[in-house]
A protein has these predicted regions:
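Short low-complexity stretches enriched in small and charged residues
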Residues: 23-29, 133-143, 191-198
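Alpha-helical scaffolds flanking conserved acidic
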Residues: 61-74, 118-120, 143-153, 169-175
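Acidic/His-rich, divalent-metal-binding segments that scaffold phosphate/diphosphate chemistry
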Residues: 5-99, 125-128, 132, 166
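Divalent metal-dependent phosphate-bond-processing catalytic cores, especially two-metal-ion Mg2+/Mn2+ enzymes
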Residues: 10-12, 36-45, 49-61, 74, ...
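Hydrophobic/aromatic-rich structural module bridging two neighboring secondary-structure elements via a short loop
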Residues: 80-121, 131-148, 159
């Protein structure tokens, strides 16, 4: 456990209906008939539910579960504006969606957030006057956890989170990151590659996994974005997210849902790629049997 059971220190209040309505009102500005928009709306609600369940599985009280839940509602706000501006969800081809979302919600920039004292290095340095340029007030009346929420949103898509974080901040960041990873596996099975990446099903099934990505996969860590060159590399990158799951509930949910196994069983028209995925499937099956224990984070 990153924080002791029952160790949530202050009462935080969330009106879930208000937060849901604010999210729906915000996304009404975008075309919900677009599969890409629908994808992210549905993803958001599933991640928020998973966040609450993960926090509850770690023995946290209702106020902490609510805090985790609302982080899920807020975590991908930037995706919709990213899609409108750039026509893609690929951060490397557009903008960092996590930073954009936090900017929209909190009305400041990443540099301003970094300068703010106490945002990630303390359990108590959270209270900040809200920037009225942001829209976080549409979702939440209680501002006592704004800094923690902003930190979690800005950190949810990073390869690694800041080691200087307090245990409490790290706990909530890991809850959000786990929930997001669990549902990303589902999204990559349920939606066509055209709706997620700048590629087609044909391209995906007729390319190979690059050697760098194969080597990285065997190191049992998530694959860095800069290594991904081919459409198949992106699928392997998604599979590799399972290496970074922190909580036992998350691993159990992945096993129950079955999407990780389905991605590992990807069928390619290229015989070399097919052999690569057979190796990926066997390696991931072995890893999941011996994954770190409950709440443990890997070193290295």
């Amino acid at each position: 456990m990153l924080i002791r059971k029952g160790g949530y220190m202050q009462k935080f209040t969330v009106d879930r209906k208000r937060a849901e309505n604010a999210f729906r009102n915000y996304t009404m500005k975008y075309d919900a008939s677009d599969e890409k928009v629908r994808l992210k709306i549905e993803h958001t609600f599933r991640v928020s539910e998973l966040c609450g369940k993960i926090a509850a599985s770690e023995g946290q009280p209702e106020s902490a579960v609510d805090l985790a839940w609302v982080m899920g509602i807020l975590h991908d706000v930037g995706r919709f504006e990213q899609l409108r501006r750039y026509g893609t969800f690929v951060d490397a081809l557009s903008v960092d969606h996590a930073q954009l979302g936090a900017d929209i919600l909190f009305g400041d920039t990443q540099d301003e957030w970094k300068r703010r004292e106490g945002s990630i290095h303390s359990d108590t340095g959270c209270a900040q006057r809200r920037n009225t340029k942001g829209m976080i007030g549409d979702f939440l009346n209680d501002s006592s956890e704004d800094a923690l929420i902003e930190t979690a949103i800005r950190s949810h898509n990073l390869l690694c989170i800041d080691p200087a974080m307090s245990d409490r901040t790290r706990f909530f960041c890991n809850v959000l990151r786990d929930a997001d990873k669990v549902d990303i596996l589902k999204v990559n099975v349920d939606f066509a590659p055209e709706d997620i990446y700048n590629t087609t099903a044909y391209e995906l099934r007729h390319c190979r996994v690059s050697e760098e990505v194969m080597q990285s996969f065997d190191s049992d860590h998530a694959i860095m974005r800069k290594l991904r060159k081919t459409p198949a590399d992106f699928i392997v990158g998604i599979i590799s997210l399972a290496y970074e799951l922190v909580f036992q509930y998350s691993r159990e949910e992945v096993a129950k849902q079955g999407y990780l196994g389905e991605l590992c069983r990807f069928r390619s028209e290229d015989p070399v790629t097919q052999k690569q995925f057979e190796h990926i499937q066997a390696h991931m099956q072995d890893y999941m049997k011996t994954a770190p224990g409950v709440g443990e984070e890997k070193n290295g």
